[in-house]
Amino acid sequence: MPSIAPFLRTTPLFTISLLLRLGLLFYGIYQDAHSALKYTDIDYLVFTDASRFVADGQSPYARDTYRYTPLLAWILLPTVRFPAFGKLVFAAADLLAGWLILRVLRRRGMDEATAGGFSALWLWNPMVATISTRGSSEGLLGVLTMGLLWAVDRRKFSLAAIILGLSVHFKIYPFIYAPAIVWWMDDARLGKETKAAPQSSSIKDAVANFFTPDRLKFGLLSLITFMILNLVMFAIYETPFLVHTYFHHVTRIDHRHNFSPYNVLLYLTSATPAHAAPAFRIESFAFLPQLLLSCVLIPLALAKRDLATSMMAQTFAFVTFNKVCTSQYFLWYMIFLPLYLPNSSFLRNGKLGIFALLLWIVSQAAWLQQGYELEFLGISTFYPGLWLASIAFFLVNCWILGVIISDGARQSTRSTVKFHVE
C-alpha cells in the first residue's frame, strides 16, 4: 500500500493546500456568476462595502451591519479595484496559520511527516478552506491566535504581548488566553531558578511572587497595544467605533444561524417590545458560566500542563457557552486541533474519536435541517424542533469539552509524541 508520508512533507503539504484554496476561489467565481445561491459570504460584501466607504473618505460604519475594527476595512482597501483581494488575504492567512502549526509541532519533537499530518487537519480541512475563500475573516483570527501560541512557545513574550493586544482589538474573544499565558509563565518555564517557598509564607508573599516582572511586562505591553489601537481608531471614528466594534457584541441579540441553546430565547426577546421586556433576562447572564470556565477554571487546571490544550479547551468552552454561536466560530478552536490531538483520548481510542466526530456532525445536521425548514420552507420550527436540536448540540459539545479537559489534566508538563506517519 503506497505511503502518504511523501505528501505530508512541507513542500507538497503546502502545494496541495494552496491548490485547494485556488480551486475553491475559481469555483466561487463561477458559482457567483451562474447560480442564484451565491458562494461569497454576505459578510464579505459588508467588508468590501466598508472598504469602499473608506476609500471615498468616509467611515466604514457608514455601511450598515459593519461591526468590526476599521483595521479590517483598511486591509481590504485593494478590493475597491480587485474584488477578490480579501479572499486571497484570508486564504493566505490560513496557510500562514498552518505554517505556524507546523513550526510548533516540529519544536515538540515530531518528524516532518508526522507534523505535516497533523497540520493537514487545518491546511487540508475543506471547512477551513471554504470559509476563508467565501470571504470570512476568521482566517486572520487563526493566524493571530496561532502566532500568539508560537511566540509564547519560543519565549518571545514581547511579541506575544503585542499579538495578544492586536488580537483582542480585532475580535475581543482572545482576551481569554491572557490568564492561561500569565499562569503558564512561571520561573521554571522562563528558565529561571525556582526558589522554594517558605512554609509560613503569607498571602502577601504569594501575591508578590505571582506578579513577577515578566508577567507584569507581558500584561502591560498587551494592554498598551490594545489601548493605542483603540485610541487611534476612536480619534478617527469617535463613538461609532466603540458602539459597532465593542458595545454591539455585548448587547447582541442574534437568533439567525445561531447554534446556541439561547437561540429561541433570543428570538422571543427580539420580538418583545422594549417597554414589555422583563427586568431580569436570563440571556444577560450567559457570560457568567462562559467566562468562569474559559478565563478561570480551565486555565488554572490546564495551562501549566499543556498551554495548547488549555487554549483549545478555553476556546471550545467560550464558543459552546456563548449566546451566539455560528459555524465560523468553530474555526476558533479548530486551529488548536493539530496540537491537542496527538496526545488525546480521541486518537488513542479510535472508536471514541469516530463516535465523537459522528455525534458532533449528526447533532449539527439535525439543527441545520430544522434551520432549513425555518429559513427556506417558512415552517415555524423554533419550538420544539430547533430548540431541542440546539440543546442536543450543546450537550454533545459539553461532553467533548469534558474529554478535552480530562486529557489536559492527565498530561505531564513534558509530554512527547511517540508515533510517526508511515
Swiss-Prot record:
Subcellular location: Endoplasmic reticulum membrane
Lineage top rank: taxon: Eukaryota
InterPro entries according to UniProt: PIG-M
GO CC terms of this entry: endoplasmic reticulum membrane; glycosylphosphatidylinositol-mannosyltransferase I complex
Main localization of the protein described in the UniProt heading: endoplasmic reticulum
EC number: 2.4.1.-
Example of a GO biological process term: cell wall organization
Role of this protein: Mannosyltransferase involved in glycosylphosphatidylinositol-anchor biosynthesis. Transfers the first alpha-1,4-mannose to GlcN-acyl-PI during GPI precursor assembly. Required for cell wall integrity.
Protein name (record): GPI mannosyltransferase 1
Species whose genome carries this gene: Gibberella zeae (strain ATCC MYA-4620 / CBS 123657 / FGSC 9075 / NRRL 31084 / PH-1)
Gene expressing this chain: GPI14
